[in-house]
Amino acid sequence: TALAGVAVILPPATVNDAWAQPGGNASKSPGHVELGQGLARIWTASVTGANPRARLAASPVVSDGRLYVVDTTARVTAFDANNGAQIWSNALEIEDDGKASRFGGGVSATSTMVFATNGVGDVAALAADTGALSWQKRPAGPLRGAPTLSNGNVYVMTQDNQIYALRQTDGEAQWNEAGPVAASGIFGVGAPAAAQGTVIAGYSSGELAAYRY
């Protein structure tokens, strides 16, 4: 093929000590990450998983020695990344009529806070060391993807192609935009990518939209 003779040049591989957001970081471009040799399982832990009515789609994240994950009941749990011991667990408060839709969402973390979303449409901020709830907002819903953290904001995308920017300190909405309405959709949305003053949202229509922040 035309590319057969093109050399692939990679920068030196680097060891990462965190994977604090889905995709590694806000830009979803962690670089050339080194994979250790002789990989082996060192611990396992369990959270409430999928069933015929609820799909577990959220991936865990790792920050400052803790692993965070949200399960299909919208419960956020922190484990010790070294040995799997549970540090704390906190279920996001949801009204009874919304509990059937609480699955979905995801988590992202900083050194001090964990931000979680759920399928009902809630965005919550919890203390990284204790799990204490700082704030919980519902800008829209449902939210089937993880949040992205950048520029002091939490960026989330809804199942119906809307993107919201919420302030990390108190959850107040800073702006929102709506993408094209698609005739059909899929379960889950990709977390927005943020870098160099731009947030990029991928919509279910297949379109990408870039917003300056």
Question: Which role does the model predict for each range below?
Answer:
Residues 1-42:
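Blade/loop signatures of beta-propeller domains
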Residues 80-83, 127-131, 167-171, 212-213:
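Short loop/turn segments that connect beta-strands within beta-propeller blades
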Residues 71-72, 102, 111, 118-119, ...:
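Structural signature of WD-repeat beta-propellers
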Residues 16-17, 64-65, 111-112, 151-152, ...:
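Short coil/turn segments that connect the beta-strands within blades of beta-propeller domains
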Residues 42-61, 89-110, 133-150, 173-195:
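Extracytoplasmic beta-rich repeat domains
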Residues 27-44, 72-91:
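Beta-propeller domains
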